[in-house]
Amino acid sequence: MKGLLAGTIAAATFAVASAGEYCGQWDWAKSTQYTVYNNLWNKNAAASGSQCTGVDKISGSTIGWHTSYTWTGGAATEVKSYSNAALIFSPKQIKNIKTIPTKMKYSYSHSSGTFVADVSYDLFTSSTATGKNEYEIMIWLAAYGGAGPISSTGKAIATVTIGSNSFKLYKGPNGSTTVFSFVATKTITNFTADLQKFLTYLVNSQGLPSSQYLITLEAGTEPFVGTNAKMTVSSYSAAVN
C-alpha cells in the first residue's frame, strides 16, 4: 500500500506494506499521520488465541483499518490486546490545546458465545513532554458483554454530557497512573467530537492539571474474550490543534 510502512518495533529496516495483515505481537504499520499497532501486549493472559490487524485505506488525514481475533480461556476479566491507530503528533500542554477534532466510524462482528470487548480512545498525559505516563484518559464508545473500566469503587463518580453523548465517568489507579474512563451510556458506532472538551471537563471538575502534556492519542479496541471477532474501522481521523 503506497505511503505505508510495516515492520516490528525491533526491526532495523522497513518495507512497503501490502494490503495483507500483520499478526506478530508487536507488529505495526505506519503512514505519515498514524501508526496502526497490533499490540498483543497481554496475550499470555489467554489460554489460546491470535490476532491480526491490517490497514485498508489512507485518504488524506483519514485512515481505514481492521483487526480480527480469537481469544479464549484464561481470565475473562483481563484485556488481551489493544489494536489501535495512534496519532503522530508533538506533545502539547493541555492549556495550549485549542481543539482535538476526531471522527471514528466502525462496525463489530463476532461468532456466538461469550464476547467481551470495548472500543475506546486512549490518551496519556505527563508533566513533561518526554515524561512517563501520569494520567490516562479513556473514552469508551462501546462496552460489549459487560466490559468494565478501571475503577477504585466499581461505581461511576459522575455522569456527564459532552457534545450530544452521555458518559459515566470512572476513576481508578493503574500502578502510578491515574485513570479516568468516560464510558458511553449507549453504544456509539459513528463518533464525531472534540476530545479537548473531555480534557477541559477533567481540568475544571476532576483536578487534572492543565499544565500536563498530552503525549499519546490512540483509538482502537480492547478484547477480553471472543471468537472470530472483527472490528472494521471504515474511517478514522484525529488531530491536535
From Swiss-Prot:
Reaction(s) catalysed (UniProt annotation): xyloglucan + H2O = xyloglucan oligosaccharides
Coiled-coil region: none
Single Gene Ontology BP annotation: polysaccharide catabolic process
Annotated InterPro entries: ConA-like_dom_sf, GH11/12, GH12
Activity regulation info: The xyloglucanase activity is inhibited by the binding of the host apoplastic glucanase inhibitor GIP2.
Record's signal peptide: 1-19
EC number annotated for this UniProt entry: 3.2.1.151
Residues annotated as catalytic: E136, E222
Cell division is among the record's keywords: no
GO MF term (any one): xyloglucan-specific endo-beta-1,4-glucanase activity
Glycosylation sites: N174, N190
Entry keywords, A to Z: Carbohydrate metabolism, Glycoprotein, Glycosidase, Hydrolase, Polysaccharide degradation, Signal, Virulence
Pfam family, one: Glyco_hydro_12
SUPFAM superfamilies named in the record: Concanavalin A-like lectins/glucanases
Chain's role: Glycoside hydrolase that exhibits xyloglucanase activity. Acts as an important virulence factor during P.parasitica infection of its host Nicotiana benthamiana. Also acts as a pathogen-associated molecular pattern (PAMP) in host species, where it can trigger defense responses including cell death. The PAMP activity is independent of its xyloglucanase activity. With paralog XLP1, is required to elevate apoplastic sugar during P.parasitica infection.
Assembly with partners or alone: Interacts with host apoplastic glucanase inhibitor GIP2.
Family membership noted in the UniProt record: Belongs to the glycosyl hydrolase 12 (cellulase H) family.
This protein's name: Xyloglucan-specific endo-beta-1,4-glucanase 1
Organism: Phytophthora nicotianae (strain INRA-310)
Taxonomic lineage of the native organism: Eukaryota, Sar, Stramenopiles, Oomycota, Peronosporales
Gene that this sequence comes from: XEG1
